[in-house]
């Protein structure tokens, strides 16, 4: 197979597939990923770990206190980060079960150059491996990735769906977006006129994966997260019409997926308010007089320690502190793992074939790690 055939085959495999609502419900009976939440799908993409019994190796036994450590092939290039990755997977497992973590922001905290951004990029790349199912009407896909199950009422329809299609009660309850509600009225309540599209999350096309960054404090507003009215559409629609709204916010695009907030605590506090209701209640308000928008995904944030300390010490931010799940991403403190990091960096540069004296990388690693070590307080050593 040449490169052109290989590319075409990959493109064809990633094309959207369309189903009727009845066909989608039949798929749910056979494939639980069709109704799984974002954390469950990310766990499927990460896969099973290789378990390492550190008691069998003297060096590792002292570092990990004889624990059995999980090493995930999906993160094999992240050296010396076993604890951080295990905490992320623990967060995802609990969020997948519908526990309190589902309502919290996953926050990577660590020093500059510790690997937070690389971890975030890998999580977003993994999110692309499992498809999502999105409502469609009149050939137009939902702009906020409405899941087909949002059409059903948890009080009225849950028992029938569980009995006929094996869909657990807890997967119902996500609200319908204003876009879907308008189409439902147009169809006269006939939900069979909706179609369901199987799409693959994409970083490139911002499908179920979005990224936002703090802007200038004077001109950044919440529209970066929740979207705003598209003035080009006001010629044809009223200002409070769902079709006049531009669903361009990061929360709109990241529904059913993952939203990355870079340097979150550098953003003005007013910009962060939609995150509270999006995580706690699964919905948030837009900037105009339309009904609430749904959010059923993961919010991933990261910043350096100095911003976190400043934010934590401000008493006005207590509401956020309770809704943050902190994963510490410290510097690597193992020489063997630090050498692997240098080798990885060299392999991705032109210096891979440059001559290097024996022991150079080991000396650099020792020096770097010694510069990171601090004398512990209350130590007898």
State what each model feature region is.
Residues 34-381:
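Conserved ASCE/P-loop NTPase catalytic core
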Residues 1-52, 113:
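N-terminal accessory segments that target, anchor, or regulate ATP-driven/P-loop NTPase machines
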């Amino acid at each position: 197979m040449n490169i052109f055939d290989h590319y075409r085959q990959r493109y064809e495999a990633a094309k959207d597939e369309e189903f009727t609502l009845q066909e989608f419900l039949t798929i749910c009976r056979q494939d639980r990923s069709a109704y799984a939440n974002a954390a469950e799908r990310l766990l499927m993409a990460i896969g099973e770990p290789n378990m390492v019994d550190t008691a069998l190796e003297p060096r590792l036994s002292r570092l990990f206190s004889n624990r059995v450590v999980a090493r995930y092939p999906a993160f094999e290039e992240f050296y010396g980060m076993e604890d951080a990755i295990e905490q992320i997977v623990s967060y995802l497992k609990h969020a997948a079960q519908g526990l309190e973590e589902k309502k919290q922001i996953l926050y990577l905290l660590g020093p500059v150059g510790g690997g937070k951004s690389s971890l975030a990029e890998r999580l977003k790349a993994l999110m692309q491996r499992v498809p999502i199912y999105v409502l469609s009407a009149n050939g137009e896909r939902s702009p906020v990735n409405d899941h087909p199950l949002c059409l059903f009422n948890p009080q009225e329809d849950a028992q029938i769906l569980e009995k006929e299609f094996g869909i657990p009660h807890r997967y119902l309850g996500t609200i319908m977006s204003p876009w879907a509600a308008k189409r439902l009225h147009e169809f006269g309540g006939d939900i069979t006129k909706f179609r369901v599209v199987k799409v693959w999350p994409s970083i490139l096309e911002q499908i179920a994966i979005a990224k936002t960054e703090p802007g200038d404090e004077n001109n950044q507003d919440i529209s970066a997260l929740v979207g705003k009215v598209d003035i080009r559409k006001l010629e044809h629609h009223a200002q409070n019409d769902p079709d006049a709204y531009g669903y361009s916010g990061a929360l709109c695009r990241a529904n059913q997926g993952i939203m990355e907030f870079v340097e979150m605590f550098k953003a003005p506090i007013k910009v962060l308010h939609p995150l509270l209701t999006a995580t706690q209640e699964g919905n948030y308000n837009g900037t105009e007089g339309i009904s609430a928008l749904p959010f059923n995904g993961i919010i991933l944030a990261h910043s350096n320690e100095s911003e976190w300390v400043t934010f934590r010490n401000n008493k006005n931010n207590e509401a956020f502190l309770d809704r943050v799940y902190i994963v510490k991403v410290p510097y690597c403190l193992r020489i063997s793992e630090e050498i692997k990091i240098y080798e990885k960096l060299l392999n991705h540069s032109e210096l891979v074939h440059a001559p290097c004296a024996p022991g150079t990388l080991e000396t650099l690693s020792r020096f770097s790690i010694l510069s990171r070590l601090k004398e512990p307080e209350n130590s007898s050593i």
